[in-house]
């Protein structure tokens, strides 16, 4: 996967070695996944972003570092991606999407590819929203343990939204095909939770002090 991305999309990072090392040292403080690997790349057409590959590798793009106001905001995104890696979200989504697609293709038969693909897309979208929300809360816990306000991740989501890298709030207010009101319609079809919902959840966590271990964290330990 990384080789293919490097060949077709990503570029070598333009960040200086000292800058990369400083971010890498802070990344390692997020723990506890000692096997997590952080790589730096130029994003090309991906723009400001970070990626967690199915093998646990995390790729931080130069454009995201440039977009952030401070390193705490970068750490917020890295904590989110580390959560995906620790929980095997990338591999889980890959397995479930291919398994669901294969079953529906068998069930529908060759005569109806639309029936085979559309339900799989909806099922995977619902699952992806759950994983994104879970990763946000795990990231908030990691940041709080480092003494970083989880609101830094919320701030970064706002920046990404402004650049068009995250679902916009305007899209949440569109009209459904049935003419119904609309926030829930677009949120249901989205592959991620709405940016506003994610920001609100992170700031609610921050407002509670964010230092108490959640039930999900306790269950993982």
Features from the language model and the residues they span:
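A Zn2+-metalloprotease active-site environment signal
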Residues: 1-220
